[in-house]
Design a protein with these regions (language model features):
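N-terminus-centered regions that define maturation/targeting leaders and the start
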Residues: 1-107
Length: 107
């Protein structure tokens, strides 16, 4: 299965988790704009499931998209935190890809 995490390590309160999704089918080739991939939604730093886009309070922030290929599906419930996901993935990561983008609020 696949797992996807998006976070912002430059948030004033520490790393802010924008998106946590796991048990994504490995056949997934893309995620269309405005959609969520098939899989189980974890909890972001707003305390909700699903994607929360970038909206930094000030300055330029780095946003990391981390995609993990796993050797199994994870037995975790919807709303799982990134910390619990990372713990469950230990020993199951086959490969990892990472993309970083910068974003600054306009105005």
């Amino acid at each position: 299965s696949l797992a996807l995490v998006m976070d912002d390590p430059d948030a004033p309160v520490g790393t802010w988790d924008h998106w946590v999704v796991f048990n994504i089918p490995p056949s997934t080739k893309q995620i269309a704009k405005g959609t969520e991939p098939n899989g189980v939604a974890g909890r972001n730093s707003w305390g909700r499931t699903g994607y929360g886009g970038p909206c930094p309070p000030s300055g330029t922030h780095r946003y990391f998209f981390k995609l993990y290929a796993l050797d199994t599906e994870l037995n975790l419930p919807e709303g799982t935190t990134k910390k619990d996901l990372e713990r469950a993935m230990q020993g199951h990561i086959l490969a990892k890809a990472e993309l970083m983008g910068n974003y600054k609020r306009g105005g």
